[in-house]
Amino acid sequence: MSDEKLEQNGLSRRSFLGTAAASGAGIAGAGLLGLAGCSKDGEQAAANASGAAPVAKAQGESKPGQLSSEVGPGELDQYYGFLSGGQSGEMRLIGLPSMRELMRIPVFNMDSATGWGRTNESLKVLNGNITEETRKFLKDSGLRCYPNGDLHHPHLSFTDQTYDGRYAYANDKANNRVCRVRLDVMKADKIIDIPNASGIHGLRPQRYPKTGYVFANGEHITPVSGVGKLDDAKTWNAVYTAIDGETMEIAWQVLVDGNLDNGDADYQGKYSFATCYNSERALTVQGASSNEQDWCVVFDLKAIEEGIKAGDFKEVNGVKMLDGRAEAKSKYTRYIPVPNSPHGCNASPDGKYIMLNGKLSPTVTVLDVSKLDDLFAGKIKERDVVVAEPQLGLGPLHTAFDGRGNAYTTLFIDSQMVKWNIDDAIKAYKGDKVDPIKQKLDVHYQPGHNHTTMGETKEADGQWLVSLNKFSKDRFLNAGPLKPECDQLIDISGDEMRLVHDNPTFAEPHDLCLVAASKLNPGKTWDRKDPWFWQDALEQAKKDGVELEKAAKVVREGNKVRVYMTAVAPAFSIPQFEVNQGDEVTVYVTNVETIEDLTHGFTLEGYGIAMEIGPQATSSVTFKAVRPGVHWYYCQWFCHALHMEMSGQMIVKPK
């Protein structure tokens, strides 16, 4: 519908978007709007959803912040942002407040620029920790590796409740994997399969004393081996996984009820959490949204570790699995009832509270972490842990924090960001006549995740908030039917939120982690003394009597040929080599440049091969020489004035 037709029908673009979103939510029945209409607050939320003016409740002489997003030429950002790439399979690195994209880190995807998914080093990461069942599937399917991924929820490693600059972790919902990215080189060094679970979604690292565990939610219920039956969905379960963040091996799994959504960990190292929908064990949208309540599952880490030591588990596909189902009356879990289909799960930076975002309810449920000991001891009931449940608006999905006692929640249906005070919400829950909502700000459009600077640590600084919006509509020049997402930068340093900048992003960010630049110290070149990524190349070179840093040698072993060369602008150390048609060829290239930002590449024409070789790195690729003739190779990185001359030839002699 055009803007002109919208206006003729008495609808603004925002009204149209809000109505469309609310209509879409209607498939869940009347639950969402019904809950929204259960009070005056709900009436206001429903009004906002239909396009009414936003509510602004600034207190006294409240003023917006005055931060600037401008980062001039040659100036540096104050924060790194680790942005999920969603179905692109990659992780993205941005600077804040400029919102400039600094780097794309290929992880679960195949990448033409760097050769990720084609080089031997990347294939070792992609396939080095997969199950035998996956290995057989890839072989039978004629695949070197999975060609795609759906990367959600990047989060950094912790020591003592704050980022330690070592690793970033993220999940692959499409193919049930978890990755680790080394922050010194911004490359994935480990990717593991998660057996028994389906649809790895929520992912969070342990905060204290360190990471520790990385917790991964299996979203989709399936017939877990030894428990479920293929033809009876009522016997299907989800699986919660704890991964050792240092070894990237699975420590344990817990069998649970319902579809696990998002999760978080406490600040004390005692508990972890997962929101859960589909308590009905249904297989359709309508069926999975019929109950008035679902739950949050709380996991007692000490009890689980003791259960593992005591042997209270079953080994399922090589993994130790404990029974955390409600029907088992498990000592490892507690199920806290919350309104229908909770989504986001966020711990406040003071370590006191867990926020469970309602999605189909206009509420956020606030859990008091200090009450969990009594809950597991049987001294109180599950809902006694709830200390607030403010009604904020339609479609609350995720909550972030400023470290000053305020929370910021995305309202998907209302297309708004709502700022509210946690203490006031607790007072209101006790019956005090206080409104916790401080301000509502329009965002554009339909926000999902949000994140504040350092907001997931004890060092939350309350400077910036980023809203990851699922629709951009009219915010940018029309780029065709597929529109970019819209990431919006909001200044939260003052009393009022202030929208500062719109940033288009390619499909599709699902989360963001904002860390002070001072917390990280990436290298400027690769370290030859830390050859983890090219360890196999180093070992093979030693067997062949080759020193990689001085290599210019071709080694033949039957029909296997290994070509060792170096790259120094503007030449490869081997300008030409010959092989026979049908040979298995491995090319090793070592970039011996010692200065930063002098990356080389190796592209072999007509063979679908291109790879990146960073300063002081070694990269390799293996292929079969099936095409006879002359095939040029060249450096695809513009590294020198004689860049185009940096080339050579592979001559393939026909049979």
Can you annotate each of these PLM segments?
Residues 1-15, 23-30:
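N-terminal secretory signal peptides
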Residues 61-75, 119-123, 127-163, 203-210, ...:
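Structural signature of eukaryotic scaffold interfaces centered on beta-propeller domains
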Residues 73-76, 165, 216-235, 274-293, ...:
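Short, conserved, GDST-rich strand-edge loop motifs in beta-rich repeat architectures
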Residues 98, 186, 299-315, 367-379, ...:
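Short loop/turn segments immediately following beta-strands, especially the blade-tip
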Residues 103, 144-145, 189-193, 249-254, ...:
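A short beta-strand motif characteristic of beta-propeller blades
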Residues 235-245, 291-303, 483-492:
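Beta-propeller blade signature
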Residues 551, 613-655:
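Extracellular/periplasmic metallocenter environments
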Residues 555-581:
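N-terminal edge beta-strand
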